[in-house]
Structure formats: C-alpha cells, structure tokens
Regions:
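Structured secondary-structure scaffolds
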Residues: 1-169
C-alpha cells in the first residue's frame, strides 16, 4: 500500500476543499465564517483523532497518547489518512503517527461486509456461541494483514474443529 501513496504523491496535489454547500447537504458542522457551508465530513472526522486524546484540552492526556505509534485504518480510506491527515497535522505543528497500516476487508461471500447489504455477522453473537479466544484465533489465523479475507461460518467451524478441538482438545 506504500506504493499506492507514493504513486499518488507523484501527481500534482490540488488544494483540499474542507467545506460543502448546505444546498447539497442538510447536515454537518457549520463554518463559522459562512452560513451557507458546512465542514467536509472527513475534515472534522480526522480532527476527532486528536481531540479525543485531549488536544487543546489536556496536555498530560495528549502527551500520553500522541503521537500515535500506529494508525490502523481500512484500505479504502488510505489516501485520506496517509496524505490529507498527515498534511493537516504537519500544518498544525502536531507530530505525525509513526506508522500507518491499512488492513484489508473481511468479505462475506466474496463481497465486502456491509450492514446495508446485510451480509454481516455479529461478532458478539459469535463470541457468545464459541467464546472470545476461538474467535480471536480464527481472525488471526485466517487474515493476512493488509489483504482481504473471506469469512464463512463453515470456515470458522472447520478451523475451530480442526485446530482447536482436534489439536488442542
């Protein structure tokens, strides 16, 4: 994924518009200098990373949690987090995360899991039925970091039976 970002950065970068007209959006944080616009959702969402750990509110808390050693994100939002977010931090004089890692997707039936598609599994139900350790084991065993992985109940039960029940008893 590093090469994706390096390739992106080889192209000229345009200014990032951080506002959206209210005529297109009926929600958002108002801009204090223009009543007709709201803040672009990714801009205000990214700021949450530092405000949640005390930026401009608690120096002790902020210094405890920032800079982030690892910034773990989904591969579909890599550019936002590896280009725009560091740019925002740098311009504010805030240290950048030390490492950014983009994880793959859990797929269900070869499609990205999505609440709107209804192709999801509730992990809490899985934990209730099988316990937290078997679920952790499956997730770590089946997903190669940075790549997509397909989840099926059949593969979960197969891994549970073959590795945990048979090998570890």
């Amino acid at each position: 994924r590093k090469n994706e970002i390096l390739g992106f950065l080889k192209n000229p970068l345009n200014d990032l518009c951080i506002s959206r007209p209210k005529s297109r959006l009926n929600w958002g944080i108002d801009l204090p200098f223009d009543d007709n616009y709201v803040t672009y959702v990714w801009f205000d969402a990214l700021i949450n990373y530092i405000t949640a750990v005390g930026f401009e509110q608690s120096d002790d808390k902020f210094e405890k949690w920032w800079p982030a050693s690892y910034h773990l994100i989904g591969k579909d939002i890599l550019t936002t987090h590896a280009v725009y977010w560091p740019t925002m931090l740098f311009s504010a004089g805030i240290p950048l995360p030390l490492s950014i890692f983009a994880h793959g997707w859990w797929l269900m039936g070869d499609s990205k899991m999505s609440k709107s598609l209804g192709n999801i599994i509730n992990p809490m139900n899985l934990i209730d039925d099988y316990g937290v350790d078997p679920v952790r084991y499956y997730l770590m065993r089946e997903m190669v970091l940075g790549h997509d992985s397909n989840f099926t109940m059949e593969s979960f039960i197969q891994r549970y039976n073959s590795d945990l029940a048979n090998d570890f008893g």
